[in-house]
Amino acid sequence: MTESERALLTFEQLFDTSRAIYKKQKKILEIVLEPFDITVLQYLLMFKIHQSGSTPLSKLAMSLDLKPASVTRMTDILYKRQLMNRYDSPDDRRIVMIQLTEEGEELIEKAAVQYAKMGAGLYQKLDTSQLQYLRKLAGSLTKLAEGCSEKSGN
């Protein structure tokens, strides 16, 4: 087997594994979010805001790799449900800032706890050293992927 064939096989295995894990995690998250009546994307949007506090809408769109119009539609829905607030940036009125309401923060916290409980089963057969290695490897792969996307202009 040539070096390029080994690299391709490794890439295919990594891609298949990543996709399988993503599908399982997404399914768990969908089950958790059903009683809250929000989608996975809405949850991810709210989680990003939860992590960073008050955030410009354009920055959210970039971090989720979505078009600003899609993020605007999602924030409209969540705003109507009183899960987030929108306001103009004090530095530049053209910039729309998004912030979770107290109700939005509570929803994120409740959903995160339930997701952690259900998602733990996905990794329960791994011991502590395997989990630590997985975290380290995931971090390295994320940095590698970010470096590749910067070089390609994505």
Swiss-Prot record:
Transmembrane annotation, as ranges: none
Keyword annotations of the record: DNA-binding, Transcription, Transcription regulation
Cited Gene3D superfamilies: Winged helix-like DNA-binding domain superfamily/Winged helix DNA-binding domain
Pfam families: MarR
DNA-binding listed as a keyword: yes
SS bonds (residue pairs): none
Gene Ontology MF term list: DNA binding; DNA-binding transcription factor activity
GO annotation terms (biological process): regulation of DNA-templated transcription; response to stress
UniProt keyword Repeat, yes or no: no
DNA-binding interval(s): 57-80
Boundaries of every HTH marR-type domain copy: 1-143
InterPro entries: HTH_MarR-typ, MarR/SlyA-like, WH-like_DNA-bd_sf, WH_DNA-bd_sf
The protein's name: Uncharacterized HTH-type transcriptional regulator YhbI
Organism: Bacillus subtilis (strain 168)
Gene from which the chain derives: yhbI
